[in-house]
Amino acid sequence: MILQKIKNKFFSWLESHDRKRVIMDRVDNEPYLERYYIFLKDRTWFPFNVFVHKFLKSDPDDVHDHPWPYATLILKGGYYEWIPQFNNYGEKIGEIAKWRAPGHFRICSSTSYHRIELDPNVTAWTLFMPGPQKREWGFLVKNKWIPNGDYLESRKQHST
């Protein structure tokens, strides 16, 4: 009970100090995740940052990479992480789903692909620590990397 009160006060403080951002799904314009800036809100030169994420919606069906290497720790709840499998020629041949439960810790490069699928009965909270930006991010579609903006614009056009 005391820990719950501390957590509530902490997140209320972050929100009251403009350290909460709701990231919208850019296709359906629905809330995708809540990001709480634990460290720097506007990082430009510092080599890493620390966020708490509360996932509100699953990722799109295609796997994506990230602009930075990152580490993530599941704090509460969990999710299915779909990870692509590749053949010896670098072609995607399938995906496997792994349940990521509280306590799961993972370090990934900026070129690691995955997608998150939520269990509708579980709220996923993670500690997310991105490193320095290495590249733009995008999605893997039919064994081809598609830049984030192009991918989302294509999805938006196909959803209308």
Predicted features by range, described:
Residues 66-81:
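Short, conserved beta-strand element in jelly-roll/cupin
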Residues 51-66, 110:
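Conserved short histidine dyad/triad with adjacent acidic residue
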Residues 84-115:
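Short acidic-glycine-tyrosine-enriched beta hairpin
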Residues 107, 115, 121-138:
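A short hydrophobic beta-strand segment most commonly corresponding to one strand
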Residues 44-45, 70, 82, 100, ...:
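Beta-sandwich/jelly-roll carbohydrate-recognition scaffolds of carbohydrate-active enzymes
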Residues 1-47:
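A short, N-terminal "cap"/entry segment at the start of jelly-roll beta-barrel domains
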Residues 60-66, 98, 117-119:
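Short histidine-centered beta-strand/loop micro-motifs
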Residues 136-160:
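Active-site or metal-binding loop neighborhoods of secreted/extracellular toxin and effector enzymes
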